């Protein structure tokens, strides 16, 4: 669980592989080794939660498992809220504004 909280890029893969934990086969074990190889190659990346920081991130998520028993595809929605001072610091840290920055700022103005 700690891995999926601090590494959102692994959440789907770990969730999908956990479905086969009781009866894993060779294909699933090879996928586990690939995930572990990825984790080993990306050490130092991820989210860091400091106990002394005054940054308060608020996030809300909702998911609903679809009825397909084969793919188990789900519908997921989320909303993340960040303080305004954090947006100012983020804006200053980006040297060359690009399309991605404009889209992010426009999306954040909707909040």
Swiss-Prot record:
Other remarks in the entry: A stretch of 270 kb of the mitochondrial genome is duplicated within the centromere of chromosome 2 resulting in the duplication of the gene. The expression of the duplicated gene (At2g07729) is not demonstrated.
Superkingdom classification of source: Eukaryota
Keyword vocabulary terms for this entry: Mitochondrion
Subcellular location, record wording: Mitochondrion
Any one GO CC term of the record: mitochondrion
PANTHER family: DNAK FAMILY PROTEIN, GAG-POL-RELATED RETROTRANSPOSON
Name by which UniProt lists this protein: Uncharacterized mitochondrial protein AtMg00240
